[in-house]
């Protein structure tokens, strides 16, 4: 079944979720793969929100929250949420002045370039993923005990991500991608592996994975990589594990998309 949704529209996201909920479909895997890049000029969605912020984070936050009933439908089945972040999240910031509700339709001086904004949005993916997994483990949320949430860097892949950039930048990046990026056909390997690999599933959620080990299918590497505390995964940006940043992003995003906190 194919259901259309436009992440530049909160109404479209809500309609998409409504259709799935009405069909009583159980979702075993949710891969949040949508993303865009823009130029430095201000571009607003129909909701009056800066477009990149909405597509790359807010609509994915809204969709995930709305679909939780389909993910927690039965206690004897596990579900996995995979947030497609990026290694660029390491240079991102959770800037509370730039991303609060009063700065959604104006270019704030803290939002310097489109690349900084993109990096910020990819950090939000990692922060939200960890926040979500932490929520699933809290007392009283046993109905979500079978769900885990992880974030990943898919690698440098041939794609249309650059189409929102100024034409000269798009040409440059397309050329670079054609020379050194992974073929599009391989672009989903990291996402699918993170969602289905038995040994990764056994480690639960709240993790961040880079593409290198996953792409090489190296099981031993997956189980002894950089994050020695967990024994698996890669250590993400500090904000991804900061409860303070997690709570701020959750509360702010909930208010913007019109959802109450649990």
Where are these regions (language model features)?
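Rossmann-fold NAD(P)H-dependent dehydrogenase/reductase core
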Residues: 1-163, 259-260
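Intrinsic disorder
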Residues: 7, 11, 43, 181, ...
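A generic structural signal for short coil/turn motifs at secondary-structure boundaries
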Residues: 39-40, 218, 236-239
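Short coil/turn segments at secondary-structure junctions
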Residues: 47, 51, 111-112, 116, ...
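Short, flexible, mixed-charge acidic loops at enzyme active sites
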Residues: 94-103, 164-168, 218-230
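Alpha-helical membrane-targeting segments
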Residues: 108-115, 156-158, 162-186, 221-222
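A generic structural signal for secondary-structure junctions
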Residues: 166-170, 199, 258
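C-terminal helical subdomain
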Residues: 174-234, 243-247, 251, 255
């Amino acid at each position: 079944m194919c259901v259309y949704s436009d992440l530049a529209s909160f109404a479209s996201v809500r309609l998409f979720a409504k259709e799935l909920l009405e069909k009583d479909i159980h979702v075993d895997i949710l891969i949040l793969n949508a993303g865009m890049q823009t130029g430095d000029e201000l571009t607003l969605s129909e909701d009056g929100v800066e477009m990149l912020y909405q597509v790359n984070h807010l609509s994915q936050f809204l969709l995930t929250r709305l679909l939780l009933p389909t993910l927690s439908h039965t206690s004897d089945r596990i579900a996995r949420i995979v947030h497609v972040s990026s290694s660029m999240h390491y240079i991102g910031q959770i800037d509370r002045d730039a991303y609060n509700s009063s700065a959604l339709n104006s270019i704030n001086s803290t939002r310097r370039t489109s690349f900084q904004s993109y990096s910020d949005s990819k950090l939000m993916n990692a922060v939200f993923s960890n926040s979500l997994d932490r929520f699933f483990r809290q007392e009283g949320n046993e109905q979500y005990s079978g769900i885990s949430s992880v974030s990943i860097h898919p690698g440098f892949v041939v794609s249309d991500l650059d189409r929102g950039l100024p034409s000269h930048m798009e040409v440059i990046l397309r050329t670079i991608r054609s020379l050194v990026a992974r073929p599009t056909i391989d672009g989903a390997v990291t996402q699918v592996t993170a969602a289905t690999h038995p040994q990764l599933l056994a480690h639960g959620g709240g993790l961040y994975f880079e593409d290198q080990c996953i792409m090489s299918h190296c099981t031993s590497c997956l189980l002894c990589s950089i994050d020695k505390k967990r024994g698996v995964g890669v250590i993400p940006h500090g904000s991804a594990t900061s409860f303070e940043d997690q709570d701020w992003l959750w509360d702010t995003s909930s208010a913007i998309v019109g959802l109450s906190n649990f």
